[in-house]
């Protein structure tokens, strides 16, 4: 039953992503470590301003049924209710910010936080290179399978953002050129990553993947 309900049949989705946390506080505000209440409010105010830009877009004609926001609980906890009241789609992150390995932001309590805000999509950002650290990949797959099963048992949608960062040897093989890595190696590595993730029992409803430069490379990505 859960498998049959996989996917998203609502047509196009245009989602404004502002769920950045660690990078947002350091690069935008120069705040290191855990922000104090005053700093947290400053960051939260910036998130509200970003959200208000989306409300303005809807007022000017953007279709709310195809438009959404991806916002975090830490700094954007006031946004979900406002977004829902406007008929916007809501996506919220599950992963811990700023980690190379996927961890739950709220540990074993992840389900409570999802149910509290009731997003249309629960999103993960995962760095997975099929030729990377095998033990880390296995640990990530275990956590992702836990999340995938939890979501689909409750008929909740799973949004999977996949990044495939270059391993040192892969980058060396293309002369240290990141553009060549993206064009020549990443499409096949993305295919391998998605295959490994799905073979591990992790089923996403929506895949958000990095673009590929050549049309023939698109056929390598099994989606």
What are these regions, as identified by a protein language model?
Residues 1-136, 203:
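Alpha/beta catalytic barrel-like cores
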Residues 27-30, 48-61, 106-122, 129-130, ...:
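Alpha/beta enzyme core
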């Amino acid at each position: 039953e859960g498998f049959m309900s996989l996917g998203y049949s609502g047509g196009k989705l245009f989602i404004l992503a502002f769920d950045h946390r660690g990078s947002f506080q350091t690069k935008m505000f120069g705040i290191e470590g855990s922000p104090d209440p005053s700093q947290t409010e400053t960051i939260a105010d910036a998130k509200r301003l970003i959200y208000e830009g989306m409300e303005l877009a809807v007022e000017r004609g953007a279709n709310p049924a195809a438009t959404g926001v991806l916002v975090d609980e830490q700094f954007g906890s006031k946004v979900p209710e406002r977004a829902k009241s406007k008929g916007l789609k809501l996506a919220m992150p599950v992963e811990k910010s700023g980690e190379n390995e996927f961890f739950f932001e709220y540990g074993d309590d992840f389900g409570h936080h999802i149910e509290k805000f009731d997003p249309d999509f629960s999103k993960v950002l995962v760095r997975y290179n099929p030729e990377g650290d095998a033990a880390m990949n296995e640990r990530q797959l275990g956590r992702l399978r836990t999340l995938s099963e939890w979501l689909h048992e409750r008929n909740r949608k799973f949004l999977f953002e996949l990044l495939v960062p270059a391993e040192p040897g892969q980058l060396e093989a293309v002369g240290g050129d990141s553009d060549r890595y993206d064009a020549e190696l990443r499409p096949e590595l993305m295919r391998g990553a998605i295959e490994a993730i799905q073979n591990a029992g992790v089923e996403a409803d929506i895949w958000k993947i990095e673009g590929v430069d050549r049309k023939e490379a698109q056929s390598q990505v099994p989606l």
